[in-house]
């Protein structure tokens, strides 16, 4: 599935380009949020980082999948995570929100994980 590939590409990009290791842990999302914040502060145009943001969102989705047993859902070219209690989450859109200064992949993962535990 595409999001799994996008997530793997983000891991490689972060390791090779930024020398940051991502291990699919919830804690690693702090590094991803910080990287997105740095890119935004540099004034990079959205179009120049759209693919990277998609990869970061897919990576966050994979973290949620691995933490909660969720699965990827696709419809019309859009991808979401469906957690076991039936809730849908959009980590790719959350990465875009992070770039706009209004989101957090780390907090999205925390909320999704907490929702499953309730």
Where are these regions (language model features)?
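A recognition module on extended beta-rich or small alphabeta surfaces enriched in W/G with H and D/E
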Residues: 81-118
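Enriched - but not universal
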Residues: 9, 33, 75-76, 83, ...
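N-terminal low-complexity, intrinsically disordered segments
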Residues: 1-50
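Generic helix-packing signal
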Residues: 11-14, 65, 116
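Generic structural signal for hydrophobic core residues of well-folded globular domains
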Residues: 36-39, 67-68, 99, 112
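Amphipathic, interaction-prone secondary-structure segments
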Residues: 43-85
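A sequence-level detector of short, solvent-exposed, charge-rich linear segments
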Residues: 26-29, 51-55, 83, 114, ...
